Amino acid sequence: MAQDRKKVLVLGAGYAGLQTVTKLQKAISTEEAEITLINKNEYHYEATWLHEASAGTLNYEDVLYPVESVLKKDKVNFVQAEVTKIDRDAKKVETNQGIYDFDILVVALGFVSETFGIEGMKDHAFQIENVITARELSRHIEDKFANYAASKEKDDNDLSILVGGAGFTGVEFLGELTDRIPELCSKYGVDQNKVKITCVEAAPKMLPMFSEELVNHAVSYLEDRGVEFKIATPIVACNEKGFVVEVDGEKQQLNAGTSVWAAGVRGSKLMEESFEGVKRGRIVTKQDLTINGYDNIFVIGDCSAFIPAGEERPLPTTAQIAMQQGESVAKNIKRILNGESTEEFEYVDRGTVCSLGSHDGVGMVFDKPIAGKKAAFMKKVIDTRAVFKIGGIGLAFKKGKF
């Protein structure tokens, strides 16, 4: 019986990969399959909380927990390694710690920052990408305030922050900044009126997923707390001084001591090296989340471009979708092991909430708009539910937002 065991290999312990494994370990026995999870870090981090850790309103350690803390060690073999190559036909995955065979593969390698080729953006701007970048950014912001307070010759740029992008991540980061700035001003004796936060967005509208009414609420709330918006203003370069933007065909330099890029992500760069037809690290999947020509390879999360039947555009890359994909794949792997056909993935949109710091927010929940404290509360519910779905009540109690 043991020789008939299938080898299930899961790459990545983000929302999609970890949800797959935690559901699968409950659904199958050790006689049915050998599950191996490979992740480059020993920890999982809540990617949707990175804006808080980046602003310094949440300690970076509160964003992460050990991967093995949610695994059944008799069911899952965890390997801390970096994936370097996926060989679909040989059914092998190469890592910096060795080569692993598979019968069924789940690719959930997550995202990296996408700067769209903007000159200097990778070199001179902080990225909201992982817990390491979050820790670096929050420390840098505080260091700038400390330096301003200690310097005899004040540099106002120490108190100036540029944020590129007024999408979900950018706006949530701005909200956290408006919570953090008063604390820093109080700690270092800085006049808050001297702090300048500017958000630059190339598109004609911020938060394009929300109605004008919700967007106006977000803009008003953040502007009242000191944020200046430059909408329909493309960033053409980033340098050590800040952003270079284009206004009416002319280039302008915006100066700041801190530049942050929060305007784009893409799937893992390993995707282009491993598969054909990949765009920005994402591959179009079939309706059951496998890829063309390979019924034994699932691709989910940030690396997946899933187009629902009858639709033209793929679903966005969100934690909610990634976790639902993980559940679906776990069920389908169980079906494959039972000799049954796979089922199509059906996404259930339970709503989206964008936080504006810890006390306000905007969102759509079950097709109803919400804003203010109600939205802020709902965001905490969503964050806590995500932890509960993977780690149960114990992890939710330890890491949740209540």
From Swiss-Prot:
Q: Which InterPro entries match?
A: FAD/NAD-bd_sf (IPR036188), FAD/NAD-binding_dom (IPR023753), NADH-Q_oxidoreductase (IPR051169)
Give the enzyme's EC designation.
1.6.5.9
Q: Which cysteines are joined by disulfide bonds?
A: none
Can the keyword Cell membrane be found in this entry's annotation?
Answer: yes
Active site feature: E172
* Gene Ontology CC, one term: plasma membrane
Q: Example GO biological process term?
A: aerobic electron transport chain
Q: What does the record's cofactor remark say about binding?
A: Binds 1 FAD per subunit.
Keywords in alphabetical order: Cell membrane, FAD, Flavoprotein, Membrane, NAD, Oxidoreductase
Q: Which Pfam families match?
A: Pyr_redox_2
Q: Which cofactors must be present for this protein to function? A: FAD
| Main localisation | membrane
Give me the residues that bind FAD, please: G12, A13, G14, Y15, A16, N39, K40, V83, D302, A319, Q320, K379
According to UniProt, the reaction catalysed is: a quinone + NADH + H(+) = a quinol + NAD(+)
Q: Keyword check for Flavoprotein, yes or no.
A: yes
Question: Per UniProt, what is one GO molecular function of this protein?
Answer: NAD(P)H dehydrogenase (quinone) activity
Compartmental location: Cell membrane
Q: Which family does it belong to?
A: Belongs to the NADH dehydrogenase family.
Say what the protein does. Answer: Alternative, nonproton pumping NADH:quinone oxidoreductase that delivers electrons to the respiratory chain by oxidation of NADH and reduction of quinones, and contributes to the regeneration of NAD(+).
The protein's name: Type II NADH:quinone oxidoreductase
Organism annotation:
Staphylococcus aureus (strain MSSA476)
